[in-house]
C-alpha cells in the first residue's frame, strides 16, 4: 500500500476523507503500534473506528503449539505465529475485551473504546 503523503494521500487519505468508511483495528498490542491506534482515533474520530479481535480458537489456551487450518501455530504469551515462520502472525489470542483494555492503556478514552468495540460494529 502506498504511504500517506501530502501530495498523494493514497488509500489512507481517501478512507479518512470518505465519511462512510470505517477503520477496523486489531488492538491487541501486537498487530498495531499504540501510536497508530491513537492516530487512527484522531483521524477517523471515535464514531468511525471499530475494534476487532482477530481472535483464534487458541485464545485463552496456554502457551504451546496448536493446529490451524492444516498448519501449526505457536502461542507464546500474547503472540500467535506460524510454526514454520515465527515472524508471521497467525492471528490474535486476545479477546475483544482484551483489545478494549489495550486501547484504553494506549490512551484512548474509555467511552471511545467501548463505543468502538460495541456500538460501532453493530
Question: Language-model segments: which ranges?
Answer:
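Divalent metal-binding pocket/active-site signature
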Residues: 1-10
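A conditional alpha-helix N-cap/helix-loop micro-motif detector
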Residues: 4-5, 30-33
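His/Asp/Glu-enriched, well-ordered alpha-helical/loop segment
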Residues: 10-29, 36, 41-122
